[in-house]
């Protein structure tokens, strides 16, 4: 993985979270984008059928198709690289996701950053991806409750 991040080791991530970031990098690369953005991360989390993200969003009455379509449109509008190789590093907003996700480990008494932590961190942001989730009806309180239920094994 070529990903660069500041102030955090990628070894603090679960294997699934590492895979998501690799897929986000690939999506950014194939889209011709300069950096890996929060839109790429959320889009790959939504598209990963082994990820609990779709369940967590639906548990909070979020229209997953709406979010997915808006993400696709947002990715198409991201700046394209005209020369050189695109998508080698996380954008500032995407790097901040990792920092916030690490901070949320204490809330759930976890050791590694999972995709659930990444979703909370995206929601806590102030960028367009966070706004999209909030506009779709996702709240941090509702998300934490759904994650807690998921960890208990109730659906």
Question: Which functions belong to the PLM regions below?
Answer:
Residues 1-155:
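Histone-fold recognition with a strong bias for associated Lys/Arg-rich disordered tails
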């Amino acid at each position: 993985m070529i990903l660069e991040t500041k102030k955090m080791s990628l070894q603090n991530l679960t294997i699934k979270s590492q895979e998501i970031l690799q897929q986000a990098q690939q999506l950014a690369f194939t889209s011709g984008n300069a950096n890996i953005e929060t839109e790429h991360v959320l889009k790959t989390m939504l598209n990963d059928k082994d990820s609990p993200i779709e369940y967590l969003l639906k548990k909070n009455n979020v229209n997953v198709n709406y979010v997915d379509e808006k993400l696709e449109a947002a990715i198409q509008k991201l700046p394209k690289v005209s020369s050189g190789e695109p998508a080698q590093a996380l954008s500032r907003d995407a790097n901040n996701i990792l920092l916030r996700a690490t901070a949320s480990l204490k809330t759930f008494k976890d050791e590694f950053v999972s995709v659930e932590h990444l979703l909370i961190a995206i929601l806590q942001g102030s960028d367009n991806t966070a706004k999209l989730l909030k506009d779709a009806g996702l709240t941090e309180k509702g998300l934490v409750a759904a994650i807690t239920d998921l960890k208990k094994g109730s659906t």
